[in-house]
Regions:
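Conserved pre-motif I regulatory segment
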Residues: 8-44
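Conserved helicase ATPase motor motifs in RecA-like P-loop NTPase domains
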Residues: 167-183
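Accessory nucleic-acid engagement/destabilization modules that flank
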Residues: 1-3
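Walker A/P-loop
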Residues: 40-59
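Pre-Walker A (Motif I) flank of P-loop NTPase domains
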Residues: 38-45, 69, 170-171
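A short helix-turn-beta junction within AAA+ P-loop NTPase domains corresponding to the substrate/partner-engaging
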Residues: 187-200
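P-loop (Walker A) phosphate-binding loop of NTP-binding proteins
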Residues: 48, 76, 178
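SF2 helicase/translocase NTPase motor core
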Residues: 9-21, 54-58, 65-164, 198-247
C-alpha cells in the first residue's frame, strides 16, 4: 500500500511525533493497516517481538484520533504501563506532544460490570462507543466465544457483544507475535472479531468462491496432513504448497 492509497490523508498525522519516529517498514505497515481497517474492518499486526508493534499501532491510533474518532486499547494488565505512559503528560513520555487520548482497559475488565479500572468507572462506561479497538496480545482471544457451566460468557463473547457489535462501527486492530498457537482456527477466531462473527460479510469483500469458514477448514486439514510428514519434508515451503490459494 502506497501513501497515495491512504484514505483522508489530510489530517496531519504524518506531522506527528510518533509518525516521524517510525522506521520505513513501520510506516509502510501503518499505512497498510489503515487501508485494511477501512476495507475489511480489521487487521492483525503479527510482527515478531522487538519490531515495534506498539509504535506502529500508536501511529494508526494517531491517524484515527486526528479524525476525532474514539479509541480503546485493550491489553493485559502487565502491559498497561507503556500504553498509559504514551498518552500521559509525563516527562518521560517521548510522544507527549502528540496528546494521544485513547482509553486503556484490561482484558479482564470485559468481565466486570462495576468498580474502577484506573480512573474509569466501569459501571458507567459506554463500551459500544469506540470507533477503533486495539487489542494487545490478541492471541488471548484465540479460543473464540463460549459460555461456562454457570451460563456466563467468556471474554471473547463479551468483547464481541459489548464492544464490537453494538453502537458505532468498530474497527479492530490486533497485535500479536503469536496469533497462531497450534491450529489455524486460532487465527480465524481473532479475525472473526473484525467481521463481527458474520463470515458472509467478508466473503464478498475478499471476492472468494468459498466462505471464510470453508477456507479455514480446508487449511486446517492441510496443516494436519503436513504435521504428519517426516521431519525432512515438514518445511515451511511444503506447507505453503499444500495450502489453498484463497488462504
Amino acid at each position: 500500500v502506497s501513501e497515495d492509497d491512504l484514505p483522508s490523508d489530510t489530517n496531519g498525522f504524518k506531522e506527528s511525533i510518533v509518525w516521524n519516529k517510525l522506521y520505513t517498514f513501520q510506516k509502510d505497515a501503518a499505512l497498510a493497516i489503515i487501508s485494511k481497517l477501512e476495507q475489511f474492518n480489521g487487521c492483525i499486526l503479527a510482527d515478531s517481538v522487538g519490531l515495534g508493534k506498539t509504535f506502529t499501532a500508536l501511529a494508526v491510533i494517531k491517524y484515527y484520533e486526528n479524525r476525532n474518532l474514539r479509541v480503546l486499547v485493550l491489553c493485559p494488565k502487565k502491559l498497561s504501563d507503556n500504553w498509559i505512559t504514551y498518552k500521559a503528560n509525563y516527562r518521560n513520555n517521548p510522544l507527549a506532544g502528540d496528546r494521544l487520548r485513547y482509553d486503556v482497559l484490561y482484558h479482564t475488565d470485559l468481565s466486570r460490570e462495576q468498580g474502577f479500572s484506573g480512573e474509569t468507572d466501569l459501571s458507567k462506561l459506554n463500551w459500544a462507543a469506540y470507533d477503533l479497538v486495539v487489542i494487545d496480545e490478541s492471541h488471548n482471544f484465540r479460543n473464540g466465544g463460549d459460555v461456562d457451566d454457570d451460563g456466563k460468557s467468556n471474554r471473547y463473547t463479551k468483547l464481541m457483544n459489548k464492544v464490537i457489535r453494538p453502537g458505532a462501527r468498530t474497527r479492530v486492530l490486533m497485535l500479536s507475535a503469536t496469533p497462531v498457537n497450534n491450529r489455524f482456527y486460532d487465527l480465524r477466531n481473532q479475525l472473526a472479531l473484525a467481521y463481527e462473527g458474520n463470515s458472509s460479510a467478508w466473503k464478498d469483500k475478499l471476492d472468494t468462491n468459498r466462505s471464510v469458514e470453508k477456507i479455514f477448514r480446508s487449511a486446517q486439514k492441510q496443516f494436519n496432513a503436513w504435521s504428519k510428514l517426516a521431519p525432512s519434508q515438514r518445511t515451511t515451503e511444503q506447507l505453503m504448497r499444500m495450502l489453498d490459494f484463497d488462504f
